[in-house]
Regions:
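Conserved donor-binding/catalytic core segment of Leloir-type glycosyltransferases
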Residues: 25, 178, 219-247, 262
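N-terminal subdomain of nucleotide-sugar transferases
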Residues: 2-67
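Conserved acidic donor-binding segment of nucleotide-sugar-dependent glycosyltransferases
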Residues: 347-356, 364-370
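Membrane-proximal helix-turn-helix segments that form the acceptor-binding/catalytic region
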Residues: 44, 102, 124, 128-132, ...
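Acidic donor-binding loop of glycosyltransferase active sites
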Residues: 175, 298-316, 329
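Nucleotide-activated donor-binding/catalytic signature segment of Leloir-type glycosyltransferases, i.e.
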Residues: 271-292
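An aromatic- and histidine-rich active-site surface loop
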Residues: 94-97, 110-133, 137-147, 184
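Carbohydrate-associated surface elements
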Residues: 183, 205
Length: 417
C-alpha cells in the first residue's frame, strides 16, 4: 500500500471550515485510477475547481500521472472466475479500501465520500463516516443484479437476492446518487426509493478538448481497405462473442474480406474472445492489441470506418458509443432504449440479439461512404452539444456544493443550539 501526490489545485474552502480546503474521497471498487476514465474525469474536474482529492483504488503505475490527487493504492487481488473466487477477490478489495479509508480520515481528513463499483458493498465503508457528518455519494454506473443475470443467466438464488438487498441498502445509505443516464435515475427513484431530488444524472462522455482527431495510421488496417473498431473493457456484459459471430457471418457467409476488425482493450473475457476467433476461423481478420493508452486508443478511432457496440443491456449508456461519436465514427449497435436515446441517427440498429442483422448493417455501412460521413457528423454534433464531459461537469460539481453547504448549515445549527 502506498500513497503519492502531485501538485495541489486551487484552494476551495470546506463548508465545515472556511479556512481549510474541502477534500473529497473517491473510492472505486477493484479497479485503478489509470484504467477508470470516468474517475479520471471526476478527479480532474474536482481539482480544477479547487477541491482536494483523495483516491483509493488498485495499484497501477499509471496512477501516478494525475497531478493534484493523492492516490492511496492497494495490491490487486488475483482475478477470479468462480463465485467463491469473486468473494475472495472483492473481499480483499473491501478490506483494503476500508483500512485505507480509516487511515485517510485520520491523517488527511475528508469532507465527503464517493463510492463506485459493483457489487454494492462499499456503502458499509461510508456509513460510519456519515455518523461523523461526512455525506456519502453513490456514483452508480451499473446495476449489480442485472450484471449477475448477464454473467450467470439467472434471476434467483441466494446470491441474486443478496445483491438486491445490497443495492437497496446502498440506496438507503447514500446522501445523493449520481447515475449515468435517465434509466438508472428511474431505477434509483422506483426500485431504490431514493427521495425526490436526490439523484443527479452525470453522463460519461469524453472531454471535448481531448477528442481532436489523430492522424490515421493505415497500418492499423492490416493491409485491408476498411477498419472496424471495438474499444473498451472486456467483460461478459460487453458481448464480444456476439461481435465475433457477426464478423464470422460477414466474412464466411457474406464473403466480405476487405475489412480488418480491431478489439482494443483488456479484461476477463479477452482470452476467451481470442479463442473464439480461432474456432470461428476469423483470426486473420481480427486483432486484439490489448490495453491502449488514450492517444493510441483515439488513433484507432481516428483511423476506423465503423465502430462496433454489441452490448445487449437495455438500460446501459454505451461509453463506446460516446467515444465513437466524439470522433465522428458511425457505429452499429442493437436497438436498445438507452443506446438509441444516446446516439439517435449516429448509429445503425439491429434487432437485439440478431447476429445476422448486425453483420448485414456493417456490410451496408462499409459500402456507403456518404451515409457514414453523415452519421459521423450527427454523432459529433450530439457529442459536443449534449454528451461531452464538459456538459456534465456543472451537475457533478453541484452535487458537492449542495452537500457541503448542507453540512455547513447543520454544523451552524448545532452550534446555535
Amino acid at each position: 500500500m502506498r500513497a503519492h501526490t502531485g501538485r495541489p489545485g486551487e484552494v476551495a474552502v470546506t463548508a465545515a471550515n472556511p479556512r481549510r480546503q474541502a477534500r473529497i474521497l473517491l473510492i472505486v471498487e477493484n479497479v485503478s485510477l489509470a484504467r477508470d476514465h470516468r474517475l479520471q474525469k471526476q478527479v480532474t474536474t474536482l481539482i480544477s475547481n479547487g477541491y482536494g482529492v483523495e483516491v483509493i483504488c488498485r495499484r497501477d503505475p499509471g496512477n501516478h500521472e494525475w497531478d493534484g490527487a493523492r492516490v492511496h493504492e492497494y495490491r490487486a487481488p488475483a482475478d477470479a472466475g468462480s463465485k467463491l473466487g469473486f468473494v475472495r477477490e472483492y473481499g480483499h478489495s473491501w478490506v483494503m479500501a476500508a483500512w485505507l479509508t480509516a487511515k485517510v480520515f485520520i491523517t488527511e481528513r475528508f469532507d465527503a465520500m464517493q463510492v463506485s463499483g459493483t457489487p454494492d458493498i462499499y456503502f458499509t465503508i461510508g456509513t460510519p463516516f456519515k455518523l461523523l457528518g461526512r455525506p456519502l455519494v453513490l456514483d452508480q454506473r451499473d446495476l449489480s443484479p442485472e450484471l449477475y443475470e448477464v454473467r450467470y443467466g439467472r434471476r434467483d438464488g441466494i446470491v441474486y437476492r443478496a445483491l438486491c438487498w445490497l443495492e437497496r441498502a446502498t440506496y438507503r445509505a447514500a446522501d445523493h446518487v449520481i447515475t449515468v443516464n435517465g434509466s438508472l435515475e428511474q431505477v434509483a427513484y422506483t426500485r431504490g426509493k431514493v427521495p425526490p431530488g436526490d439523484v443527479t444524472v452525470v453522463g460519461n462522455g469524453p472531454v471535448v478538448e481531448r477528442t481532436c482527431k489523430r492522424p490515421p495510421r493505415l497500418e492499423l488496417k492490416h493491409g485491408r481497405r476498411f477498419l472496424c473498431c471495438w474499444l473498451g473493457l472486456m467483460g461478459p456484459q460487453d458481448r464480444m462473442d456476439v461481435a465475433l459471430r457477426a464478423i464470422d457471418h460477414l466474412v464466411n457467409v457474406i464473403g466480405r474480406t476487405d475489412c480488418h476488425f480491431a478489439f482494443v482493450g483488456d479484461g476477463e473475457t479477452r482470452s476467451a474472445a481470442c479463442q473464439l476467433a480461432k474456432e470461428l476461423g476469423i483470426q486473420d481478420w481480427v486483432s486484439f492489441p490489448g490495453w491502449a493508452k488514450e492517444d493510441d486508443a483515439f488513433t484507432y478511432l481516428s483511423t476506423a470506418d465503423v465502430g462496433l457496440e454489441p452490448n445487449l443491456e437495455e438500460i446501459v449508456s454505451p461509453v463506446k458509443g460516446m467515444e465513437y461519436m466524439a470522433f465522428g465514427l458511425p457505429f452499429v449497435a442493437f436497438d436498445l432504449k438507452e443506446t438509441r436515446a444516446l446516439a439517435g441517427e449516429a448509429a445503425a440498429y439491429a434487432t437485439p440479439g440478431d447476429v445476422t442483422g448486425f453483420a448485414e448493417l456493417i456490410d451496408r455501412l462499409l459500402d456507403d461512404s456518404p451515409r457514414r460521413a453523415e452519421m459521423g457528423k450527427i454523432g459529433r454534433q450530439l457529442f459536443e452539444e449534449r454528451l461531452s464531459w464538459n456538459r456534465q461537469e456543472g451537475p457533478y460539481l453541484e452535487v458537492y456544493r449542495r452537500l457541503l453547504s448542507r453540512r455547513r448549515r447543520n454544523r451552524l445549527s448545532r452550534k446555535s443550539d
